[in-house]
Amino acid sequence: MGLMWGLFSVIIASAAQLSMGFAASHLPPMTHLWDFIAALLAFGLDARILLLGLLGYLLSVFCWYKTLHKLALSKAYALLSMSYVLVWIASMVLPGWEGTFSLKALLGVACIMSGLMLIFLPTTKQRY
């Protein structure tokens, strides 16, 4: 059950990260504070997507809390690295994100996935 909550947390956090990235690229920069505040107060699509991203992070924290009640921290924490993989793939697949493929990034993703598999391999008890 802890693994399920952990996966929910990762998926929701990845979606929240994508939402925040979209909003950040469409809202005025925070260096133009009054323009940024005006855009938030207008509550247009970009501001709503920003709010959804923030709410997604909040929901992800709830799922993470449930994860830590059921799964060892050493395993749970490793799950968070899957978010990097999901966001990288989504940035290449979703229109308008302009994510680029590179062999170096693919190698990094392969390392992350290999590490996760090693961490989650069932342990066998050794007899001495």
From Swiss-Prot:
Tell me the superkingdom of the source.
Bacteria
> Per UniProt, which keywords does this protein have?
Cell inner membrane, Cell membrane, Lipid A biosynthesis, Lipid biosynthesis, Lipid metabolism, Lipopolysaccharide biosynthesis, Membrane, Transmembrane, Transmembrane helix, Transport
Could you tell me which pathway this protein works in?
Bacterial outer membrane biogenesis; lipopolysaccharide biosynthesis
Name where it's found.
Cell inner membrane
Q: Which residues lie on this side of the membrane: Periplasmic?
A: 24-35, 98-100
Membrane topology type: Multi-pass membrane protein
Q: Which GO terms describe its biological process?
A: lipid A biosynthetic process; lipopolysaccharide biosynthetic process
Q: Name one GO molecular function term.
A: carbohydrate derivative transmembrane transporter activity
Q: Which residues lie on this side of the membrane: Cytoplasmic?
A: 1-2, 57-76, 122-128
Q: Which GO terms describe its cellular component?
A: plasma membrane
Entries under InterPro entries matching the protein = Flippase_ArnF (IPR022832), Small_drug/metabolite_transptr (IPR000390)
State whether keyword Cell membrane applies.
yes
Q: Does the keyword Lipid metabolism apply?
A: yes
Annotated membrane-spanning segments are 3-23, 36-56, 77-97, 101-121
Q: Which HAMAP family match?
A: Flippase_ArnF
Reported function: Translocates 4-amino-4-deoxy-L-arabinose-phosphoundecaprenol (alpha-L-Ara4N-phosphoundecaprenol) from the cytoplasmic to the periplasmic side of the inner membrane.
* PANTHER family documented for this protein: 4-AMINO-4-DEOXY-L-ARABINOSE-PHOSPHOUNDECAPRENOL FLIPPASE SUBUNIT ARNF-RELATED (PTHR30561:SF9), SMR FAMILY PROTON-DEPENDENT DRUG EFFLUX TRANSPORTER SUGE (PTHR30561)
The record's similarity note reads: Belongs to the ArnF family.
Official protein name in the record:
Probable 4-amino-4-deoxy-L-arabinose-phosphoundecaprenol flippase subunit ArnF
Task: Give the encoding gene's name.
Answer: arnF
